[in-house]
Design a protein with these regions (language model features):
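PLP-dependent amino-acid enzyme catalytic core
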Residues: 1-410
């Protein structure tokens, strides 16, 4: 087995430094207060192309022969790896072909083209695009750059650990997102080489915990399916070449539910004014799972490439889950002035109305009652309960409406 050595990591760090930002650690007062630790973020969401992937891609290219460079590179990806390879190839003066699924959003296709790569659309899912990329590699003699299962790529990603330990030599814990394991392999292996006392914790989505399951079984296995909003780490099978390094160097694996990622997104936007993609938020959500205090912890924010529609959906879901937006249904007599009474009550309780829906057909006898659905903003759960209690005391028999349209009795 090829070995990852300190010499290779040092070489990679010097080479990668030529083309990447040395993203400086950001101290988080908010999360430090929340957890009782000193929390720092390694903001690779601020990196060129919006993610760490350029590090591994650029170092991988540097290890190729002139003949291999002349023939060109190929990879398959619908996300950050595509842009990382395209950008690294452009800087290296090497032709790159990126195979993307036909379902890839146009903005990602255009960004990849913008870095100078030739984009080929093939297959409906990543596996089909990847198979086609291997076929083209065989036909044209291209070098295939794997998104994670490549030790040179992992060595390049390890430059992140070099920067962390250089800036914060006394770091106690490093939290690393895991998809296929390339980033975690590089970071954990170098961290242990530099200081074996550093704890490295891998973080996976609960719905795509292929590394955790593989570690339990003692060998690489394939999940039957994955289900997570963290699409960048939605991997069924971790890297075969990487697995021994994860076994040796990762101290623990934490898994994160999608709802926790939604909360983490809101926390980062509101407290740090930063956009971090769902996979990068894994290490933010994991902070609350660490049963330690007074430790120096670095969470790696692996990327920040999120489309606006996804962002909007996550914000909405987050506000709903934190009871800062809710809908309540009340029944009113169908006569003038009733709506004004409800509005006056809500104003007194400082509820901010977003939307009103008036339904006269809730009852066969509309004179008996009409339904008013009120969607409003609140400051949180206590404030929401205060508003609902006020409606109850006024005789309106409120029912909370779930956003799928079902009722919740009070």
């Amino acid at each position: 087995m090829e070995e990852l050595t300190l010499e290779k990591f040092e070489e990679a760090s010097e080479i990668v430094k030529e083309v990447t930002l040395e993203t400086k650690l950001i101290y988080s007062e908010y999360f430090s207060a929340q957890t009782g630790n000193k929390v720092y973020f390694k903001p690779e969401n601020m990196q060129y192309t919006g993610a760490y992937k350029v590090r591994g891609a650029y170092y991988k290219i540097s290890t190729l022969t002139e003949e291999e460079k002349a023939k060109g590179l190929i990879t398959a990806s619908a996300g950050n790896h595509a842009q990382g390879v395209a950008y690294a190839a452009k800087l290296s003066g090497v032709k790159a072909t990126v195979v993307m699924p036909t379902t890839t959003p146009l903005i990602k296709v255009n960004r990849t083209k913008g870095y100078g790569a030739e984009v080929v659309l093939a297959g409906d899912v990543f596996d089909e695009a990847c198979a086609y990329a291997y076929k083209l590699a065989d036909e044209h003699g291209y070098t295939f750059v794997h998104p994670f299962d490549d030790l040179a790529v992992a060595t390049g990603q390890g430059s992140i650990a070099m920067e962390i330990i250089k800036e914060l030599p006394t770091v106690d814990y490093i939290l690393v997102p895991i998809g296929g394991g390339g980033l975690c392999t590089g970071v954990s292996t170098l961290a242990k080489l530099l200081n074996p006392k550093i704890k490295v914790i891998g973080v996976e989505p609960a719905g795509a915990n292929c590394m955790q399951e593989s570690l339990k079984e003692g060998h690489v296995l394939t999940l039957p399916q994955v289900n997570t909003i963290a699409d960048g780490t939605a991997v069924k099978r971790p890297g075969e070449k990487l697995f021994p390094y994860i076994q040796q160097n990762v101290d623990d694996i934490i898994t994160i539910e999608d709802s926790e990622l939604i909360f983490a997104f809101l926390d980062m936007v509101e407290n740090h004014k930063m956009i971090v993609e769902n996979s990068g938020l894994l290490t933010v959500a994991a902070l609350k799972h660490l049963n330690v205090e007074k430790k120096k912890i670095v969470s790696i924010l692996s990327g920040g490439n999120m489309d606006v529609i996804t962002m909007s959906s996550i914000v909405q879901h987050g506000l709903i889950q934190r009871d800062r937006v809710f809908t309540v249904s009340v029944l009113l007599p169908d006569k003038p002035g009733e709506l004004a009474k409800v509005a006056e009550l809500l104003a007194k309780e400082h509820g901010n109305i977003i939307k009103l829906e008036h339904n006269q057909f809730i009852s066969i006898n509309r004179n008996a009652a009409v339904e008013l659905r009120i969607t409003m903003e609140a400051f949180g759960t206590d404030h929401k309960n205060q508003i609902v209690s006020a409606l109850t005391d006024a005789g309106y028999r409120p029912k909370l409406v779930k956003f799928k349209g079902t009722y919740s009795e009070m």
